């Protein structure tokens, strides 16, 4: 592979964190969100995601807006919206097995939301406990807080608790 210049490699998305090194990561929406969203930054961050080999990128944002930009830059994506009114148990029962399948098939997965907040962090903690990577909810919460460098709030903790009620991963 040819050596590429710094700008050809793109820029790392804001709040990018590895959950499992070179396997699963999370970040803020490429380009930022709200008043901080920038089109050029979005493009540079999607280029970085592509250059790192992520496939697919899973967006949990309610709207599919801007996902077409990933298509234009050759990045495979999945839209799995997680709204404020979503039943957490139903959502996790569908999302977690799909994520496990992608990881088992050796896909390098990036999950993003509007921000690296309770929803993304809670999904991480949920996966850790549901998949059996962490033996208990408190251990999953503690590891998630270390991995994301943020404290889990009520929504994130509830997601982990709900994951404990689901049938365990096969």
Mark where each language-model region is.
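Glycine-rich nucleophile elbow surrounding the catalytic serine of serine-hydrolase chemistry
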Residues: 117-123
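Cys-dependent protein tyrosine phosphatase-like superfamily
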Residues: 1-110, 123-170
């Amino acid at each position: 592979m040819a050596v590429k210049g710094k700008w050809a490699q793109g820029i790392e998305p804001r709040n990018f964190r590895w959950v499992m090194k070179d396997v699963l990561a999370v970040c803020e929406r490429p380009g930022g969100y709200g008043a901080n969203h920038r089109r050029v930054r979005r493009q540079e961050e999607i280029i970085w995601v592509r250059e790192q080999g992520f496939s697919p990128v899973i967006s949990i944002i309610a709207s599919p807006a801007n996902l077409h930009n990933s298509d234009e830059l050759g990045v495979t994506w999945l839209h799995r919206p997680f709204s404020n009114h979503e039943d957490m148990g139903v959502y996790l029962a569908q999302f977690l097995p799909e994520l496990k399948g992608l990881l088992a098939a050796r896909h390098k997965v990036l999950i993003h939301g509007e921000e690296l907040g309770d929803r993304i962090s809670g999904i991480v903690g949920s996966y850790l406990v549901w998949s059996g990577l962490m033996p208990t909810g408190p251990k999953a919460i503690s590891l998630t807080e270390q991995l994301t460098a943020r404290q889990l709030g009520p929504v994130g903790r509830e997601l982990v608790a709900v994951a404990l009620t689901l049938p365990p991963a096969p």
